[in-house]
Amino acid sequence: PIYMRIPDGSAIGETTVMIDGAVEMPTYSTARTENEENNLGKFNTANETKAVPWFEILGEKFILTYPVGMAHLFTDPEPIMGAMDSSIGAINVMAGRPAERFRKEWLTLDSTIASVNPFPVSYPWFGALDEVVGEVRTVKDFVQDDGAWSPIDLASKSVSNLKGGTHIVWHEIGHAHNLPTAGFEAGVCNEGESNVHLLATVIYNQILNADMDTALRLSGFQDYGFRESALDTMFSPSWQSNERMCVDAWDNEMQYQTRSWARIAEIADLYGWEVVGEIHRVFYQIGTASMKDQDTILWGSRRANVNLAPIFDFWGVPPTTATRVRLAGLPPATEFIERLEFYREAIPETRAEYESVIRKLRATTGKVDRWDHYLENYDPELSETMKQRIDEIIASIK
């Protein structure tokens, strides 16, 4: 395809450009300002001829440039692009970004891309065909289905049609959004590999109509909902010692792990995604994506008009005494007490329950060293340690 790049600040007005020998790319727009000459029949017929390697669909907030070998999957683009536009809108709310974007998000696939990573941080987002749909030699080859991920997955407005690669794609696209990220001063927590999963979480919850627990579970690879993420958190030696969860004796405690972005999903479930957006927005407004933990708790609580310190405390980011004092005048997070009681009830009481919980979490954790340690070193006092920590957090709310 041939695109014209207009430098920022240009004021050239309307200009006619003539290109000899060009073949029109099949294009369809669902955007109100661009669909005056749309003809769905013409679009589908042009795709069938395969005169050019790609077709393009433009939405209000999203552009899709896909190989013509997949065109038979997009003969009815309206519901697909409607779902993608809505997804971009939901991401904007979560991220604290303006509702009106300065340009549309853009996704394309090609047989070869100049990156070892799928969907690298770029404009457009590039995906390699073989990583999405399997072995394909050229973009004109007929592709039977939409492969590991496609915007088609969203059109049904249900998580039942999601494929295994969906959260991976949103993870990579999340890096392009450069979300404000906590834990920088703690060192190597690397939560930038975790909060990118918030894109999938908000889309599954707001666009695909999943409850927040299901959205959290499906947004990462561990298959952890709130209960599993809470148990994973409580089995952290750092958490048991009331220390910031970052790195333990075995591995990073936050990178790629559901318990890292569960704290934000918890806030969204209790107070709404708009509150999450307000937390993120304050960091954009001061011009940084590096969120210090105490600043996050302080400014986030003030934007939410509720003392969020207990939520951060439970999910591995304990507030300092100074932070607690400064937030004492805000309304308490009483909505969180019921959740804490639920997490307390999940704590295993007997050795049999203890081993059952660990084996379940171990099955999908990704790294097993910590779980093997706990299996080999049963401590009957551990459940009391966990309960005491939760009781202290509940007391801080009351």
Predicted regions and their residues:
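Active-site-proximal alpha-helical
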Residues: 225-324, 332-335, 342-344
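Extended acidic/polar, glycine-enriched regions
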Residues: 1-51, 56
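Generic structural signal of hydrophobic/aromatic residues within well-ordered alpha-helices
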Residues: 28, 36-46, 80, 84, ...
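Generic alpha-helical secondary structure signal
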Residues: 75-82, 273-277, 306, 310, ...
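Beta/coil-rich, acidic/histidine-enriched accessory regions frequently appended to metallopeptidases
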Residues: 291-398
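Generic detector of isolated residues embedded in canonical secondary-structure elements
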Residues: 3, 195, 310-311
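Catalytic cores of extracellular degradative/oxidative enzymes
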Residues: 42-46, 53-269
